[in-house]
Structure formats: structure tokens, C-alpha cells
Amino acid sequence: MSAREGEKRSGVIEEFGFPAEVIQIIGRTGVTGEVTQVRVRILEGRDKGRILTRNVIGPVRIGDILILRETEREARKLSGRR
């Protein structure tokens, strides 16, 4: 693969988002438990291999691939109930 093809490919990835694999389900959050907090591993892009904690709406299970728009933010950790 030439340098130009590599640039084009990374541009396409960044345009649509970064694929990330769900490696752990941490728990449910939100007022009614509609959000699932998961730990994901970034599969491509400049942060490849980095592990993040993110909040996901909808059904999700270990091994699913999510497309993240950005890889900078990380969800706050779940805290115990008061």
C-alpha cells in the first residue's frame, strides 16, 4: 500500500468514525437504566489499541463493533447509589 492510499484510507475512517469492539459490559446507568456503560478497544485510527469507557443506548453485547465519532471523551465511572 502506498502512502497516498494510506492517507485516503485513514481519511475515510475518520470521516465515518472509529470502529471499537466491546470487551466488557460495566453496568446500566441513566434515570431508568436505558444506557449501558461498556469498555471498548479501538480497532483502527490513531488511538488503535486504546481502551475507553463509553455509554451506549440500545442493545449491546460483548464482541459487538461500535462506530465512535471520536475517541477523546471517556464516560464518567459509575458510582454507587446514594
UniProtKB/Swiss-Prot annotation:
Gene Ontology terms for molecular function: structural constituent of ribosome
Keyword Ribonucleoprotein included in the entry's annotation: yes
Keyword NAD in record: no
Pfam family, one: Ribosomal_S28e
InterPro entries per UniProt: NA-bd_OB-fold, Ribosomal_eS28, Ribosomal_eS28_CS
GO biological process: maturation of SSU-rRNA; ribosomal small subunit assembly; translation
CC annotations in GO: cytosolic small ribosomal subunit
Entry-linked Gene3D superfamilies: Nucleic acid-binding proteins (2.40.50.140)
UniProtKB keywords: Ribonucleoprotein, Ribosomal protein
PANTHER family: 40S RIBOSOMAL PROTEIN S28, SMALL RIBOSOMAL SUBUNIT PROTEIN ES28
Similarity annotation: Belongs to the eukaryotic ribosomal protein eS28 family.
This protein's name: Small ribosomal subunit protein eS28
Species of provenance: Aeropyrum pernix (strain ATCC 700893 / DSM 11879 / JCM 9820 / NBRC 100138 / K1)
Phylogenetic classification of the source organism: Archaea, Thermoproteota, Thermoprotei, Desulfurococcales, Desulfurococcaceae
